[in-house]
Structure formats: C-alpha cells, structure tokens
From Swiss-Prot:
<dbReference type="InterPro" id="IPR016179">
    <property type="entry name" value="Insulin-like"/>
</dbReference>
<feature type="propeptide" description="C peptide like">
    <location>
        <begin position="58"/>
        <end position="104"/>
    </location>
</feature>
<feature type="disulfide bond" description="Interchain (between B and A chains)">
    <location>
        <begin position="34"/>
        <end position="117"/>
    </location>
</feature>
<dbReference type="InterPro" id="IPR043387">
    <property type="entry name" value="INSL3/INSL4"/>
</dbReference>
<dbReference type="GO" id="GO:0005179">
    <property type="term" value="F:hormone activity"/>
</dbReference>
<keyword id="KW-0964">Secreted</keyword>
<keyword id="KW-1015">Disulfide bond</keyword>
<keyword id="KW-0165">Cleavage on pair of basic residues</keyword>
<keyword id="KW-0372">Hormone</keyword>
<dbReference type="GO" id="GO:0002020">
    <property type="term" value="F:protease binding"/>
</dbReference>
<dbReference type="GO" id="GO:0001664">
    <property type="term" value="F:G protein-coupled receptor binding"/>
</dbReference>
<keyword id="KW-0732">Signal</keyword>
<feature type="signal peptide">
    <location>
        <begin position="1"/>
        <end position="24"/>
    </location>
</feature>
<comment type="similarity">
    <text>Belongs to the insulin family.</text>
</comment>
<feature type="region of interest" description="Disordered">
    <location>
        <begin position="86"/>
        <end position="105"/>
    </location>
</feature>
<dbReference type="Pfam" id="PF00049">
    <property type="entry name" value="Insulin"/>
</dbReference>
<comment type="subunit">
    <text>Heterodimer of a B chain and an A chain linked by two disulfide bonds.</text>
</comment>
C-alpha cells in the first residue's frame, strides 16, 4: 500500500469535512414572513389539514379556519373601532390620544402575522402558533 494514499485522501476529504462540520443553519434563525409566505411557513411547520391526526376535514374548511384565526384579532379591533355607542346607553369610553407609533407597535405585538412580517419569526415561534 502506498503511504501517500492516506495523505491524498485527507487532502480530498478535508474541504468536505470543513463544509460538513461548519456552522449549520439553525432552526432559530429569524425570517421575515409576510402574507402568503407566513401562511405557507405556518402550514409547513404545523402541518396541513390533510396531515392532521384529527378527523379528516375538507381542505377548504381548513383554509377558512386558518384565515379566520389569523384575522380574528384584527377583526375584533375593527369592530371596536367602528362601533358607535347607543345614544344614552353605556358605551366605550374614548381612549386618550396616543401617537400613531404606539398604536402601530401595540397592533404588531398582538398580531402574530404582523409580528412575523415586521420582526421575523423562528421555527420555534411558528410552532407556538400551531393549534
């Protein structure tokens, strides 16, 4: 056996080992996910209705449920903002004037889709949103 053979093997395998043992992308890497990219990532992490262990539901019903869940908080804020108190009845007290920046920040903190779009979400963040 030629003694140079193991040396050549190390020279050829060295770069492959560096790439294999180098820093791997972590699942905690935050990625900004907006719109349909957020929904696709959520379905990829949580699984879709076809893969769920629950009773099989039609795909359309699963999509509708996901969309309702994503927009639920936004709709609640819209209903409160658009409601008019009944005359003479107890109604919502007007909120003190706050800057647009604070309202925007508060809305982003309570809406997971908006948060992932603005700040980015890791795979672990998406897992916490699974039903």
């Amino acid at each position: 056996m030629d003694p140079r053979l193991p040396a050549w093997a190390l020279v050829l395998l060295g770069p492959a080992l560096v790439f294999a043992l180098g820093p791997a992308p972590t699942p905690e890497m935050r990625e900004k996910l907006c719109g349909h990219h957020f929904v696709r990532a959520l379905v990829r992490v949580c699984g879709g209705p076809l893969w769920s262990t629950e009773a099989r539901r039609p795909v359309a019903a699963g999509d509708g449920e996901l969309l309702q869940w994503l927009e639920r908080r936004h709709l609640l804020y819209g209903l409160v903002a658009n409601s008019e108190p009944a005359p003479g009845g107890p109604g919502l007290q007007p909120m003190p004037q706050t800057s647009h920046h604070h309202r925007h920040r508060r809305a982003a903190a309570s809406n997971p889709a908006r948060y992932c779009c603005l700040s980015g979400c890791s795979q672990q963040d998406l897992l916490t949103l699974c039903p």
